[in-house]
């Protein structure tokens, strides 16, 4: 997808983004995987999630691209919901390096449900272009795995445990500024899943 000669998604694949949804006074920000195939953009949401609940009432959404793993963690904890603003056309969004204002239209009524993302406008706020940061990437990947823990079989959880130990310890070693987040995640995971 190109906007103003800047390519937001250079290749096909799954991009971790922050999805902002809103209806009335209710807002939500969730990390989701945006599936990109050419110009076809899709997200998959479980029906038990707040994002799904809001999108079926208001299909307008904001897709925020951010290089900051802390934002993903804060969104996972529900700490970004109060940062949602609405554009003049009623699209909910949070600030980020790039924000895509779009409609998320239901495509398949399964669980997870498939939504087609139809872009309306892009807002580019990049004032500096950050280099690829391995620690942020590992932390975001670990957060994806954490969201899968509740739905995985016990034997798969052991494989995820080994992967999480590697990703979290490496993120902490490479970026000491993320240490408090890593320690908090480790404490929560140990308590919740006895890993």
Specify the residue positions occupied by each region the protein language model found:
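Flexible glycine-rich active-site/ligand-binding loops centered on an Asp-His dyad
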Residues: 105-157
């Amino acid at each position: 997808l190109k906007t103003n000669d800047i390519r937001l998604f250079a290749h096909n694949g799954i991009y971790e983004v922050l999805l902002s949804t809103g209806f009335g006074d209710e807002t939500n920000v969730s990390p989701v995987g945006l599936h990109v195939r050419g110009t076809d953009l899709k997200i998959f949401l479980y029906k038990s999630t707040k994002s799904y609940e809001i999108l079926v009432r208001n299909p307008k959404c904001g897709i925020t691209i951010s290089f900051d793993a802390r934002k993903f963690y804060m969104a996972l904890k529900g700490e970004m919901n109060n940062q949602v603003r609405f554009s003049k056309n009623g699209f909910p969004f949070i600030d980020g390096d790039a924000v895509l204002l779009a409609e998320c239209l239901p495509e398949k009524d399964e669980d997870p449900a498939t939504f087609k993302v139809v872009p309306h406008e892009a807002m580019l706020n990049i004032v500096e272009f950050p280099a690829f940061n391995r620690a942020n990437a590992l932390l975001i990947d670990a957060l994806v795995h954490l969201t899968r823990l509740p739905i995985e079989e016990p034997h798969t959880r052991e494989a995820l445990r080994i992967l999480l130990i590697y990703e979290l310890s490496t993120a902490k070693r490479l970026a000491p500024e993320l240490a408090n987040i890593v320690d908090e995640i480790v404490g929560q995971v140990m308590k919740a899943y006895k890993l």
